[in-house]
A protein has these predicted regions:
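Adenosine-nucleotide cofactor-binding segment
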Residues: 99-102, 112-176
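Helix-to-beta-strand junctions that scaffold the AdoMet/dcAdoMet cofactor pocket
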Residues: 181-183
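Glycine-rich phosphate/adenylate-binding loop and adjacent beta-alpha elements
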Residues: 1-59
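Glycine-centered, small-residue-biased loops immediately flanking beta-strands
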Residues: 95, 185-186
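A glycine-rich, Thr/Ser-enriched phosphate-binding loop motif common to dinucleotide/cofactor-binding enzymes
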Residues: 32-33, 40-49, 66-87, 100-108
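Short helix-loop-beta connector
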Residues: 65-68, 90-96, 158-159
Length: 189
């Protein structure tokens, strides 16, 4: 569910991700019924349904010529990764960014960091093919996890990166993100 647009977090336009309705209402408020019995959606989203009913705030009209398999990528992975760089972390021009994970969300985060004007973008992944993709998408450096400390020393003089974006969802890379940023840096988990 999208943010409600009415609570204090939504109204100030700075923290719609903290919307209480979004966090709790989408999972607990039944939107459908069969007879008198409430019907809940899987995780509040109807993920495995062939059709679902959505509030207008959750819908974006697309050109009918855009294939749905392409449009669906933009609506999830691309917006999550690029949004982490542009909207959540607010990467600044000339900054240094380390991105853990070079899958779909990670390469979108790389693109977001590029758009924001980051000078140094380090992608971290275990998979060589994904590191190659990261370079193609704009990473200035692509390293394996064991090479992060060397990249940190080379790029930041050991002080740490301005931003770390964790795009895997693994507790180890979450911790590594905090360790990778400089004092006062931003880790986006």
């Amino acid at each position: 569910s999208p943010p409600c647009g009415e609570c204090k977090f939504c109204v100030d336009h700075t923290s719609p991700n903290l919307c209480v309705t979004l966090q709790f209402g989408s999972m607990t408020i039944p939107h459908f019924s069969e007879g008198n019995a409430p019907v809940h959606a899987m995780a509040g989203t109807g993920t495995f349904a062939e059709k679902t009913l959505l509030p207008k705030q959750a819908v974006v009209k697309i050109d009918p010529d855009i294939p749905l398999d392409i449009a669906s990528l933009i609506g999830c992975g691309v917006m999550t990764g690029a949004g982490a760089a542009l909207n959540t972390a607010k990467v600044t021009p000339g900054s240094s960014v380390i991105i853990y994970g070079a899958g779909g969300v990670g390469v979108a985060a790389i693109q977001g960091a590029r758009i924001a004007g980051a000078a140094e973008i380090v992608a971290v992944d275990l998979n060589d093919a994904k590191l190659d993709d990261a370079r193609r998408f704009g990473a200035t450096h692509a390293v394996k996890p064991e090479d992060v400390d060397g990249a940190k020393l080379e790029i930041t003089g050991g002080d740490g990166f301005d931003y770390a974006l964790e795009c895997i969802g693994n507790p180890l890379t979450m911790r590594a993100s905090f360790d990778a940023v400089r004092r006062g840096g931003t880790a986006c988990i």
